[in-house]
Each structure stands twice: as structure tokens, then as C-alpha cells.
Amino acid sequence: GWRVVAGVNGDYYDTANGIALGSVMSDGVFHNISGSYYALGFYDDGSAVMGKPDLRISAETDYDSFSISAMNYIRQTSFGIFMYDDSFNARGTIGTSEPGYDVICSVRRGELSIGGEMTLEVEDIVEGSVDTAVGRGQYVLSANLNSGENYLNALRALRVGDRITVSVDANSSEWDGVTNLIGALYQLVENGRVCSGLSAGNAPRTAVGLRRDGSLVMYTIDGRQKGLSIGATIQ
């Protein structure tokens, strides 16, 4: 294996629940999927890709297709279909007992990967104020009962035994084949130019840069220690 000589932290997370804001993948397995953040991805050969992949989760059945808002994130009250596996929390549940509509599925073929497909089969359907359990090898598609009718109708059309093809796609094929990925909140530089609209506040910072030759440079700056380190802005 590799001899590790240094490490840096990455992404931001929700301090209330520890969930990363951006997408997370390790050894080819997605732990979170969110389409709205920047990311740093690695291929098996160690090369990297950086940018905003705009990940999209799509579901298709024999008679319908619909979008999934995110995987392993807190279910929103008023919109969206969310997907969960058994790693979302220590209880192995979807994490909420607010009234919802949950479709419990098992994996029949494939796995979630960028540019790939996974086939699910509907095993059970739960409606009500239930913190639905997610077993090993299962996924749950879930929507709050206050969500828009289009989301609820997509789930209510499903029946036990139905097959669902779930795919994850990026805005560029350069993300296909990535096996490790971590999110980032800001892009600092693009094509050698500093991006506009960056925060001016000082704080501890971690940054990663991708050179034109494909090599990486990593920065970590301490902060919030009066008299020792005040951190840095991201401008």
C-alpha cells in the first residue's frame, strides 16, 4: 500500500448531524450525493479531476422517470425525493419520523457510480410518521407528505416488484471512473485567475490546487489562535 506522509481535512459539514455538505465517495462507494457543490475526485491511478460536477441522480421505471434530489441528506419538508442507504445514520434509518412516503428497495444489479447504473426492486412501501429502517443492501426512496404532488405521485405509482434503474451523471465524462471524491464549498482560482465573490473573513483554511501537469498542491492554514495564527481569507 501507500506510505502516508501527510493528510488534510476536506469539505464543510453540518455541525448538527455531521453530514458533509458536498458529495463523498470512497473506494467507489457513494456515502453522500449532492449536486450543488464543487468537488475533487481521484481515479484509481492517483490522477485527479477538480471542478463542479453537477451530479444528477435519475430514476427510471417501465412507465415513468423522475429525479432524486440527493442521497443521504436530511429530507426536506416541502420538496424532493431523497434516497438513503443503511450508512446514513447509526440507527440504520432515514432519520426522520415526519409524515412521509417511503419506498423500500433491494439492489438487483450494479452499484451507484458516476456514469453507471444500479437496478433496484421495490420490496415494501411505508406511508405515515415512521422513521423507516434501511437494511443492509437496501435503499429507500422517500418524500415528505408536504412535498409537491409530482414527487409524491412518482413514488405512489410504484408497486411491490417494480424495477427501478437509478443512474448518477455528471456534466462531463471526465468524472466517469472516479473512485474517491470529496466536496468543496468554494472555487478559488479558475484558469489561473482568482474567482470573484469570495469571502473576506479570516479563518482556518484548507485548499487544494490542480496544476496543468496533473500534480496537486495542498495548503492548510491554522487560525483562531490569538497571538499565534489568525488564519487567512479565501480571496
Q: Where are the model-predicted features located?
A:
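Gly/Ser/Thr/Pro-rich low-complexity, intrinsically disordered segments
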Residues: 1-235
